[in-house]
Structures are given as C-alpha cells and as structure tokens.
Amino acid sequence: MIVPSIDISGGRALQLIEGETEALDAGDPRPLLEKFSVVGEVAVIDIDAARGEGDNEGLISELCNRARIRVGGGIRDIDACKRWLDRGASKIIIGTAATPELLRQLPKERVIVALDSRGGKVLSHGWRRTTESGLLERVEELRDQCGGFLVTFVEHEGHMAGTDLTRATEVVAAAGRTPVTIAGGVSTPGELEMLDRIGADAQVGMALYTGELTLGDAIAAVLRSDRADGLWPTVVVDEAGVALGLAYSDATSLNTAIETGRGVYHSRTRGTWVKGETSGATQELLAVDVDCDRDTLRYTVHQHDGFCHTGTRTCWGEDRGVTRLQRRLSGIGLSPPPASNTARLLREPPLLAAKLIEEAGELAAATEPFEIVEEAADLLYFLLVKLTAAGSTLEAVEDILDRRELRVTRRPMNRKPEES
C-alpha cells in the first residue's frame, strides 16, 4: 500500500532530489495532509530537524491533531520519542539513534526504524554522512525490536525513475515478520503492485506532487477482482463504522471519489455514479481502506439523509443507538418543535448545565448495575445535547480519546482539591 510523504523545511512542504536539491515547493502542508490522509497514515518528516538546522515542531504538532501521521526527522533521544508519542503521532520514525537500548524503552508497535541507504550502506545526519553499517545487517539486528522499517534508497529519491526492487526484496526477507516501507524513486502503479506482492508498502512523495501518480491509481494497483467485470465490492460505512450498504467501484470511480471528496461508485447500469446527485442523499468521503485480501474496498463517509433507495439510513433498515440519537438531537436543533424538552435545553444553557451536574451526581452515587446503566443513559443524553449545542459530535470526542490513548506519559489520577 501507499504511504504519502510530506517533507517539511521552513514550514513548507518541499520535495528534494537525493535529499539535497530542492525540486518542488508545495507550500502549506495542511491541505496536502487533508488530501493524503484519506488513504491512511501519512509520513511527515522534519527535514530541518534531521539536518540539525532548526525544527518545525509547532507545525508538526498541529498536524498530529489533524490526521494519523508518522513523525520523523531529528528524533534522537528518549525524551524526543516520548514527546512525539504524547503529542499523538501514530508512529515515530527513528534513524541512526535507533539503538537496542533506546528501542527497549518504547512501545515496539509504534516505532519505525529509518534506514537511509546509498550503495548498501546506511547514511546519517539527513543523508549527509555515510556510516560503516550495512543495510541488511542493520535490518537483521533490529527487526525484533521495532514495529517496522522505513528504507530509503537515497540514490533514487526524487528522480521518479524507479526504485531498487531487487534490494527491496532482500530487505523484506531480512526483516522477517517486521513490516517494511520502501522509499526512493517509486512512481508507477506497477512498482506499487510489485512491492505489495513482496510484502512491502511504498512511501511516495514526488510522484504524488507532480501528478505522475494519483492516490486512486496507487490504491487500484494493489486491488484484484474475481468478477468478470473487474469491479471491486465497496462496503460503505459511516463515521461510527455502521455499514450503510454495498456498492461497487472501478479505477475511474475510485479516482473521482478521492479527487472530489465525495461518494462516487460504478453502477453496472449507469457507469460512474455520484451518490446523491439526483436524490440529495450526498456523501462526504472521509477514508478509503483496502481489506487484507486486496479484493474489497471500504469507504467511510458522512452520509446526508438515508443511504438506501427506500429512504432508510442503511440497506438493512434504520440504525439504532447513540449515533441515531445524536442525529435526532441535531435535527431538533435545526428545526426545534415547540414543546420539545431537548429544544428547551438547547436554548437554555443554565438549565442544561444544571441537569448535567445533577445526572453526573446521580451516576456517581449509583451502586446497583441496572441503576448505573439507567443513570449513565440519562447523563449520556444530556452530554449529547451539550455537544449538539456546541455544534460538535460524539465522533469528535472519540477522536480526542483516540489521541489520548496514544500518550505514553501518564498524569497521576488524583482528586482535585475542593473549593473552600
């Protein structure tokens, strides 16, 4: 699979040839992250920190709150590792500082060891110094102590003339069961397919920036189909992961969906089909994922109105639970019925605040299992009203919790002193 890359220097997204010559200035990295993150994790590399020439910590910390990113560049000690993990980096990328002693202190699954190579030797200091370490020997030494490798063939980086597939195959074999991502020169769907077949991901920058490769073509490259028409089943889910229905995609609809940020599919009768174009039940595309067998897509969407042609939320009828309640409360906020208690809470913040405090106290005092569940339901309702009043959602709360789970430094769980 593809891992889009954003290299940052001086607050701007740059593309360099062999890590030195500036070939392209893509400007503000934020729009790039928004575009790239639809297909999964994005690698964000601090070029300045890697070279020891300043850093872009503030900007990259902000990017950690926007998407799942792998952060690399200048991470050389345990304090820097923990700092980035606490800031919400899904993974950290460590270069020549990745010693067994350092790796033992970190959550293995969230550490990628970067091995930048030229002529089979490992480089350091932002690709400017050659070490005596052999690439394959280094992989074998560290493979049981990290969650993955990022191997960059520096002599191919930025040229878009192809990567070293032979050396990539050797790296994957040396890594054993540890995942490998290859960077340097990858620019065609064929290379992505070959790398996927040998069990490696591809980190791609220049080819995406220049338009030589699209995100849609990158995903399509690894997909296969046993259907006569070559279509890929596409499971459509909402932000909560609730299945809305099943559709089909081809390369054209996949590319169009990613480029436009909408739910676009392939209809066997109508060809390329934009969901909601006639019905108004439109979709905002949030994520595209490929399953483990490479034969099914999953689109995560924000669905407006019902997904099914019958008007129901899903093709299996109406959904239920908290997400449905949240949508109902949002509807009341937009068009409040005159006698609605929810509408009253939305227009009287002091009343809502009092009810939240009251229900939280009742939940804290509850002791019996059923009583606890009942009080939790009461509190959850008022919590959802509070979120609705703020124009926010439970999904936003989940995002915060997901990021907090990534922290490796924990604060003590103490009671706040009571006010006198």
What are these regions (language model features)?
Residues 18-36:
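Short catalytic helix/loop segments, enriched in acidic residues and glycine
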Residues 58-92, 101-103, 166-202:
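Catalytic cores of alpha/beta
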Residues 8-22, 82-157:
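Conserved anion-binding
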